[in-house]
Swiss-Prot record:
Gene3D superfamilies: von Willebrand factor, type A domain (3.40.50.410). Pfam families: VWA_2. It comes from Methanocaldococcus jannaschii (strain ATCC 43067 / DSM 2661 / JAL-1 / JCM 10045 / NBRC 100440) (Methanococcus jannaschii). Signal peptide: none annotated. This is Uncharacterized protein MJ0910. It comes from the Archaea. InterPro entries: Mg-chelatase_DI-like (IPR052989), VWF_A (IPR002035), vWFA_dom_sf (IPR036465).
């Protein structure tokens, strides 16, 4: 499956998740990471239409400022958890997990440091790895999942229904 097809499949699955969240009156947020930084493009909201539009227009490819994405995600979730301590926080990260942009110096260490804070905060994390199958594995998604207890899936393993089932199982466990 080519990179564009993999990302389109992931976007389709997330759109299904957005619709499910809307029906349950859950809130969604979106952080995009590309070029040299991550940015909050959708603060937590119930607007599925806005989330769907932003997701469809989201470009793929280029650099992967993964450390900044995890840092920003932690900050956004931390604020939301402080405002609403009874929420069940679920973070879904879709990436090839090949960090290549540092916030300061060591991008891999920065990713692990941010993930440690996320795990300590009790945020449920689902990693969806878009790195193509090959003998040479560069991405660190599986290592992140193993180290911090995050759920990990290759994009090829997932369907829209599978992602919804994963999120529903997290909600039931709390």
């Amino acid at each position: 499956m080519g990179a564009m097809r993999r990302m389109e499949a992931a976007k389709g699955a997330i759109i299904s998740l957005l619709l499910d969240a809307y029906q349950k009156r859950n809130k969604i947020g979106m952080i995009a990471f590309r070029k040299d930084k991550a940015e909050l493009i959708l603060p937590f909201t119930s607007s599925v239409e806005l989330g769907e539009k932003l997701l469809k227009d989201l470009p793929t490819g280029g650099k992967t400022p993964l450390a900044d994405a995890f840092i920003k995600s932690y900050e956004v979730f931390d604020r939301e958890i402080r405002k609403n301590p009874n929420i069940i926080p679920i973070m879904i990260v879709i990436s090839d997990f090949k960090p290549n942009v540092a916030v300061k110096e060591d991008y891999v260490k920065e990713v692990f440091d941010a993930c440690e804070k996320i795990a300590e905060k009790g945020i449920n994390v689902i990693l969806i790895d878009t790195e193509p199958q090959s003998f040479i594995k560069i991405g660190i998604g599986k290592e992140i999942a193993n180290r911090f207890g995050f759920k990990y899936y290759k994009i090829e393993e997932l369907s829209k229904d599978k992602i919804l089932d994963i999120c529903k199982s997290l909600e039931i466990n709390f």
